[in-house]
């Protein structure tokens, strides 16, 4: 029978890259660690690790096992925290997975309220570049709740937070007729070099899709990983940028226009199963206070 201790040993060996370092981190002797790993492999019917002179490498069976081991350990830790919280014996931690742009623009007001009301519960943010990575991490049990674009076909509970609006940022010194209406046709910016997002960033895909719908492929003057950097670079004159409206600071020097065809995405909080009371309370705080 597989035990949580054995799964913890497996994950630690993989993460540290050696039995010696894993034994030190786990505060056990190396023979005891090796014995538990052999017992785990015997129980599963095959080798999980290939022992190399200076490292270890997962076998195909080990690669298949590892994500399930991580998910089981995460579930066990959440169960422990939930039980101890219910008994009032300890503070807890919420693991919140999200994408970079949401942690920047949507989350801060809700986190401020949560911290005020629940100072005993820490929040650990796990941030991803793309919504697909976020969905995969949540499916693997790496967080209590995920916040981001609604994943198609998600099998668990989904709670809609609202619709995120995108705006176009332009340099402050380039006023045009569009400023009077506050609206810009993206097709008029087809010849511009854009402030774009790095490949692999979920917003890069959104910009490409939006511009394609307007009849052109955006040419990048510069690419950035940071959502917060895009409007600053655009305001400095490097080119137009398409950004979530909620990431703009209160005082901002650039020109901000709405696309003539609105660009929006629905954001949601989603979990693998019915949320525990603590996670459910956090989701309610998001619904009430997130900036969407």
Q: Where are the model-predicted features located?
A:
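A short LG(V/I)-centered, amphipathic sequence patch enriched
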Residues: 41-60
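Secondary-structure junction motif
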Residues: 177-178, 182-185, 192-214, 276-283
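Beta-alpha-beta core module
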Residues: 155-160, 164, 228-274
């Amino acid at each position: 029978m597989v035990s949580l201790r054995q799964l913890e040993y497996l994950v630690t060996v993989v993460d540290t890259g050696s039995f010696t370092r894993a034994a030190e981190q786990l505060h056990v002797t190396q023979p005891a660690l090796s014995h538990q790993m052999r017992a785990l492999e015997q129980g599963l019917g095959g080798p999980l690790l290939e022992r190399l002179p200076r490292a270890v490498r997962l076998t195909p069976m080990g690669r298949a096992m590892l994500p399930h081991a991580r998910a089981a350990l995460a579930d066990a830790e959440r169960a422990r925290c939930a039980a101890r919280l219910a008994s009032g014996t300890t503070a807890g931690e919420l693991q919140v997975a999200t994408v970079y742009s949401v942690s920047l623009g949507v989350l801060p007001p809700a986190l401020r309220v949560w911290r005020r009301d629940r100072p005993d519960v820490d929040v650990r943010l796990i941030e991803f570049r793309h919504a697909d990575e976020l969905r995969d991490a949540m499916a693997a049990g790496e967080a209590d709740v995920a916040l981001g674009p609604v994943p198609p076909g998600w099998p668990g509970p989904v709670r809609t937070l609202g619709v995120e609006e995108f705006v176009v940022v332009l340099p402050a010194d380039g006023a045009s007729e569009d400023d009077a209406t506050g609206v810009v046709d993206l097709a008029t910016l087809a010849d511009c070099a854009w402030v774009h997002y790095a490949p692999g960033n979920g917003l890069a895909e959104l910009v490409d899709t939006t511009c394609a719908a307007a009849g052109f492929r955006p040419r990048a003057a510069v690419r950035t990983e940071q959502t917060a950097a895009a409007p600053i670079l655009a305001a400095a004159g490097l080119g137009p940028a398409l950004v979530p409206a909620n990431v703009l600071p209160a005082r901002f020097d650039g020109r901000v226009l709405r696309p003539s065809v609105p660009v929006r995405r629905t954001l949601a909080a989603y979990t693998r199963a019915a949320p525990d009371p603590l996670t459910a309370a956090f989701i309610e705080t998001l619904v009430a206070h997130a900036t969407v």
